[in-house]
């Protein structure tokens, strides 16, 4: 699609979103577009420090969990001594960027709003690690904590998954992997999904949206996919193209959040319509005036905080519902 045919989203953003787009962090160098992947990872970590500041204080603990691929670092956020459930968080970053520090504030706020222990999983990044390694690491982490719950003062009778962007795909894929492989790590009471990608290769929103402002041009999306997958056949795998999985039965309740001007919004719309058509419990909410990744910007955007609280309310409601 010719760039001039795309919707001029920068003129249609909310005032809060415009303020974020126009915000210049003092002393922050430009994005190293020609840098290697490690340089870009370090820049992303540096750029996210501002957005992670002033997060709620609570007890945290770091734990290295053994997996078939080696130890994976996890971070436990415990807002109170006892917890009614455990929520596993998978960070976004296109499978190639991000870690527990880049999403620290998001996890702290989720822990505060749910009152539950949140466990961030620092899964191995692509292209060094390819599909399905991140999913298998996540499942191994869940299995480990289900077997060592008392040691970490966890309630793993009720668990959930949450994630943003690529992390949302990993969250839903991991829950489906547990179901499909008959692995029990606790009762999955809810999945919280913020602006994820779920397997579409093309869509109206991918044609109309995406640019330098969000790092989600068609070329960007192709690059993330090629870094993550082992080969072209993986595109059709039911744990990558989740629409090729069975979404007609036993899907845990899903909170599906999208950003209005996100090229990935049609993934969320299709997921919601599919689950709804098959009477699978779900809730969909679109946040007007926003771009992809807006969840990071709760220091300046009240709607980002609203989106986190909406997900937390969904999760807490499922804690009280027998399943």
UniProtKB/Swiss-Prot annotation:
It is an enzyme of class 3 (hydrolase). It holds the Pfam family Abhydrolase_3. One of its GO terms (molecular function) is carboxylic ester hydrolase activity. InterPro entries: AB_hydrolase_3, AB_hydrolase_fold, Acetyl_esterase, GDXG_lipolytic_enzyme, Lipase_GDXG_put_SER_AS. A motif (Involved in the stabilization of the negatively charged intermediate by the formation of the oxyanion hole) lies at residues 91-93. Keywords: Cytoplasm, Hydrolase, Serine esterase. GO terms for cellular component: cytoplasm. Its EC number is 3.1.1.-. It is found in: Cytoplasm. The keyword DNA-binding does not apply. The active site is at 165, 262, 292. It comes from the Bacteria. Displays esterase activity towards short chain fatty esters (acyl chain length of up to 8 carbons). Able to hydrolyze triacetylglycerol (triacetin) and tributyrylglycerol (tributyrin), but not trioleylglycerol (triolein) or cholesterol oleate. Negatively regulates MalT activity by antagonizing maltotriose binding. Inhibits MelA galactosidase activity. Homodimer. Interacts with MalT and MelA. Belongs to the 'GDXG' lipolytic enzyme family. This is Acetyl esterase.
């Amino acid at each position: 699609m010719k760039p001039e045919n795309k919707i001029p989203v920068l003129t249609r953003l909310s005032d809060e979103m415009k303020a974020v787009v126009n915000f210049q962090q003092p002393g922050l160098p430009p994005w190293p577009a020609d840098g290697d992947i490690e340089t870009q990872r370090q820049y992303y970590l540096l750029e996210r420090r501002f957005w992670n500041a002033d997060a709620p204080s609570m007890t945290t603990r770091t734990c290295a969990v053994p997996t078939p691929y080696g130890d994976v670092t996890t971070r436990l956020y415990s807002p109170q001594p006892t917890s009614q459930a455990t929520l596993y968080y998978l960070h976004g970053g296109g499978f190639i960027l991000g870690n527990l520090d880049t999403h620290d504030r998001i996890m702290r706020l989720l822990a505060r709003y749910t009152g539950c222990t949140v466990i961030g999983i620092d899964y191995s990044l692509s292209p060094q690690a390819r599909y399905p390694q991140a999913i298998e690491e996540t499942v191994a982490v869940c299995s480990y904590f289900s077997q060592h719950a008392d040691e970490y003062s966890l309630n793993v009778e009720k668990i959930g998954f949450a994630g943003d962007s690529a992390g949302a795909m990993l969250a839903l894929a991991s829950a489906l992997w547990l179901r499909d492989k008959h692995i029990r790590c606790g009762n999955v009471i809810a999945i919280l999904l913020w602006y994820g990608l779920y397997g579409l290769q093309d869509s109206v929103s991918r044609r109309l949206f995406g640019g330098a402002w969000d790092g989600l041009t068609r070329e960007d999306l192709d690059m993330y996919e090629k870094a993550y997958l082992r080969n072209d056949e993986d595109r059709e795998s039911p744990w990558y193209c989740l629409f090729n999985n069975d979404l007609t039965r036993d899907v845990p309740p899903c909170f599906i959040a999208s950003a209005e001007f996100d090229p990935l919004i049609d993934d969320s719309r299709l997921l919601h319509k599919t689950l709804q058509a098959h009477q699978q419990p779900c809730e969909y909410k679109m946040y007007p005036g926003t771009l992809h990744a807006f969840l990071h910007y709760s220091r300046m955007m009240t709607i980002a905080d609203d989106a986190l609280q909406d997900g937390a309310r969904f999760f807490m409601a499922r804690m009280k519902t027998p399943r």
